[in-house]
């Protein structure tokens, strides 16, 4: 099975499940995020990262520590609560380079960063991201912010995070996974 077929199977199976109390399925959420990135004119790798940002959840690797995930990182961007980002990026790295995997890995850290640096951001979040923020480490401290800002893909992770936050609209019918398949196929490493 190719990378794109494997991903498509996840979107068709677990992607049809409820998404942590949100009004859309996890697959709809991820496809909405990819569509928002595409509509914003993001580079192909960033569209892929937005589409795949919660792939760790689709694979059952949640922030509660189930099915692996690394409990942290020496890079200053991780906490014990971002396992789905870490696990998803690690799994995706068998096919994609860092331009796709790093924003996936860092999208939880980006939430913590935005909570620390952007007044009012926390108030924009739905209930589940606010709840998980506590065990993801809370808003970043100054040293964590500096470490995050120094990461090569931090800006892309913040963009993915914003699309992640906006991609929960039950009135929006996102394109199907097949819409993104050619983009993903073009990004798969040979």
Labelled PLM ranges:
Residues 1-190:
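Metal-dependent phosphohydrolase cores
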């Amino acid at each position: 099975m190719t990378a794109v077929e494997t991903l498509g199977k996840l979107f068709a199976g677990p992607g049809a499940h409820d998404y942590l109390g949100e009004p859309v399925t996890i697959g709809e959420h991820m496809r909405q995020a990819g569509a928002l990135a595409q509509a914003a004119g993001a580079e192909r790798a960033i569209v892929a990262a937005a589409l795949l940002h919660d792939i760790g959840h689709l694979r059952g690797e949640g922030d509660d520590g189930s099915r692996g995930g690394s409990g942290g990182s020496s890079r200053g961007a991780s906490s014990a609560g971002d396992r789905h980002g870490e696990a998803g990026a690690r799994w995706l790295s068998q096919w994609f380079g860092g331009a796709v995997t790093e924003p996936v890995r860092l999208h939880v850290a980006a939430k913590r960063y935005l909570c620390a640096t952007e007044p009012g951001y926390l108030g924009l979040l739905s209930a589940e991201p606010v709840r998980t923020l506590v065990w993801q480490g809370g808003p970043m401290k100054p040293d964590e912010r500096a470490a995050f800002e120094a990461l090569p893909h931090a800006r892309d992770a913040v963009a993915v995070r914003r699309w992640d936050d906006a991609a929960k609209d039950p009135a929006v019918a996102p394109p199907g996974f097949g819409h993104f398949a050619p983009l993903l196929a073009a990004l798969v490493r040979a």
